[in-house]
Every structure is written in C-alpha cells, then in structure tokens.
Amino acid sequence: MAPITGSNFHLHLVSDSTGETLITVSRAVVAQYANVTPVEHVYPLVRSQKQLDRVLAEIEEEPGIVLFTLLEKDLVERLEAKCQEINSPSLSIIGPVMQLFQAYLGAATIGRVGAQHTLNADYFRRIDALNYTMMHDDGQHVEGLEEADVVLVGVSRTSKTPTSIYLANRGIRTANVPLVPGIAIPRQLESLRTPLVVSLHAAPERLIQVRQNRLLSIGTRAGNDTYIDRQSVADEVTYARRLSAKHDWVQLDVTRRSIEETAAAIMKLFADRQRQRQPE
C-alpha cells in the first residue's frame, strides 16, 4: 500500500470491550508524528457478526488504518479479509502479545472478552481510591490526610487535581493541598507519618501561561492581577520550594511533564517507598 499524502487520515479502532486499550496505544503512536491528526472512529463492544457488519460498512466508506482488539476468531478473520479487500492496513494490538505469552508460558488463553475489567479486588480498590481522592481535592477534609497513600502539594495550576485523579485510577488514594503564601498550611499536613508527600513545582513562565489560559477559558480579564504577575508568581514558587525543603517533602518539577509523566514519576516514588518499608 502506498503511503498517504497529507496530515489527516481515518483511524478505525475496533474492540469487543471498551476500546480503552486501542485509544491509549494509538494516541501514544500518533504523538510521535508531527503535524499528523487522525480522524478517530471508535467502535466498542463489537461482539457479533451483525455489529461487525456496521463497522465494516463505515470502514469501507472512509478507509484508513484499522486497529483492533477482538478475541473471536471468526470476527478477526472477517475483519482482516475485508481490510485486505479494500486495501486498508489492519493490525491486532493484543494478538502478537498474546502469542508471545502463550509461547513463553505454554498455556492457552481463557478467551474471555473484557477480562481486564472483571469486578475483582483491584477494581474495588480503584473505586475506593477515586472516592477518597474526590473527597480530598483542593484541601478538603484535611482531617483525613493520614489515610492517603500520596498527598500532593503545590501552588495553583501545578496539575494537582488531574494528577490526583490519574493516580486514583491506578488505585492510589491521593489528596491534594494548595500552597498559598500568607495562608498557613493545615496542621495535619505538617504531622503526616504514613503518606508520601510530593510537592509539585513549575517554572514561573509556565505557570503564568497556564493561568492566563485558565482566565481566558472562564472569560476573565487579568488586568494587573497578582495571579499572573511575574514577580508574584516567582515569589509563590520560591515560597513553595522553601516550605517543601523545610518539611523534607519530595519535590518534583512538572514544567515539561505531561499529567501521565508526572503520575508515572510519583507511582515510581510510591512503589520504591513501599518496598523500603517492607520487612526483610
């Protein structure tokens, strides 16, 4: 198949489950290509020939790359045959990985659709973490901070809330507390013994940019607001760094990090800490 010209193309994601795996993998790959914008077509819960018929009709109407996570052999064969017929490249995202596992383990798969979404202990742990995190967002209910796995602190717009939610989705109970010059931090934060406290920092220039975008999004004129004043923001950052050093909190610069990268760094810190605390 000859490569397409231009920056836009159709990307068809066909799944017999939620489609989350396909979305995550495809977006990670697309991010490696500059000026490329796929038109995503997501087809979740495709589990019958009739459902697949509708998907194939749409793919034929707007051909492009087809990625899929289907376990039913008949569905896979039909999808691949149709893609070959219309000259659309197709690839099973989990097929090669399953083959590798099967060869190494010498065991067949259970073939259960959506097995990763089973209501097991991990699922309920994530739900519990999400409930806790939502209840302890932005300095709420500080009396329960000791029950957290991780407590994030930082000045405004250091991605505390989205990072907290991301961690909660990984089963990590996360609270976050804003650091504001002139306002004392909660006494509970100063006396924590169990949670990992991580202080998020960003360069003043980055904070100003994010804050300006925030003001624009809510239709507020900045004026001479200290919220985006260069010196005021620099003073905030200095205050947060000094306070973090005083309390020996882990400090993490998020200036050039995405939410996912920040969360990954925190998860590693948390895992390392858990291992250190385990008795030998």
From Swiss-Prot:
Superkingdom classification of source: Bacteria
Entry-linked InterPro entries: Kinase-pyrophosphorylase (IPR005177), PPDK_reg (IPR026565)
Catalysed reactions, semicolon-separated: N(tele)-phospho-L-histidyl/L-threonyl-[pyruvate, phosphate dikinase] + ADP = N(tele)-phospho-L-histidyl/O-phospho-L-threonyl-[pyruvate, phosphate dikinase] + AMP + H(+); N(tele)-phospho-L-histidyl/O-phospho-L-threonyl-[pyruvate, phosphate dikinase] + phosphate + H(+) = N(tele)-phospho-L-histidyl/L-threonyl-[pyruvate, phosphate dikinase] + diphosphate
EC numbers on record: 2.7.11.32, 2.7.4.27
TM stretches of this protein: none
Tagged with keyword Transferase: yes
Keywords associated with the record: Kinase, Nucleotide-binding, Serine/threonine-protein kinase, Transferase
Protein residues bound to ADP: 154-161
Matches recorded under HAMAP family: PDRP (MF_00921)
Name of the protein: Putative pyruvate, phosphate dikinase regulatory protein
Organism in which the protein naturally occurs: Nitrobacter hamburgensis (strain DSM 10229 / NCIMB 13809 / X14)
